[in-house]
C-alpha cells in the first residue's frame, strides 16, 4: 500500500500536478486537471466567441496569456488585454469574444460562502 504524504500537522497533501498549457488538446476549451479547482485553457480565434452561459456557484479568475478579449459579464462589457487578470462571479451571463487570436487560463473555484 502506497503511503500518502502529510504536512507537519498530519493533513494529507495532494500530489503536485504540472501541465504545459500550449500542449493541451481541445478548443475552445481544454481542461488542465481532472479535479477541483476546475482549470481550463480558453483558445479563441479573432472574431470567435463563446455564447452567453453561466457557471453557477463559482468564482472565476481569467488570466489572459495572449491576445485581446471583450468579455460580456451580465449587462457590462470589459476589455481584457494580454497580461491582465480578471476575477468575476459565475452567477451571471458570461460571453467572451476574441478581438484578436487569444489564449487565456480560467480557474473556476467553488464558492465557499
Q: Which residues does each predicted region cover?
A:
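Short acidic-glycine-tyrosine-enriched beta hairpin
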Residues: 74-91
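A short, N-terminal "cap"/entry segment at the start of jelly-roll beta-barrel domains
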Residues: 1-36, 40
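A cytosolic small-molecule/anion-sensing beta-strand core signal
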Residues: 65-66, 81-82, 100
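Glycine- and acidic-residue-biased ligand/ion/polar-headgroup-sensing regions
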Residues: 57-74
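Ligand-binding loop in jelly-roll beta-barrel domains
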Residues: 90-113
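Histidine-centered metal-chelating micro-motifs
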Residues: 49-51, 86, 90-95
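Conserved short histidine dyad/triad with adjacent acidic residue
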Residues: 25, 38-55
Amino acid at each position: 500500500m502506497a503511503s500518502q504524504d502529510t504536512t507537519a500537522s498530519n493533513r494529507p497533501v495532494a500530489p503536485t500536478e504540472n501541465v504545459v498549457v500550449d500542449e493541451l488538446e481541445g478548443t475552445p476549451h481544454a481542461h488542465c486537471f481532472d479535479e477541483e479547482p476546475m482549470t481550463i485553457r480558453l483558445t479563441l480565434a479573432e472574431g470567435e466567441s463563446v455564447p452567453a452561459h453561466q457557471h453557477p456557484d463559482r468564482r472565476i479568475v481569467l488570466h489572459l496569456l495572449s491576445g485581446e478579449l471583450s468579455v460580456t459579464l451580465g449587462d457590462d462589457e470589459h476589455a481584457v488585454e494580454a497580461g491582465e487578470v480578471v476575477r468575476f462571479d459565475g452567477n451571471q451571463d458570461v460571453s467572451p469574444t476574441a478581438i484578436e487570436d487569444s489564449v487565456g487560463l480560467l480557474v473556476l473555484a467553488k464558492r465557499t460562502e
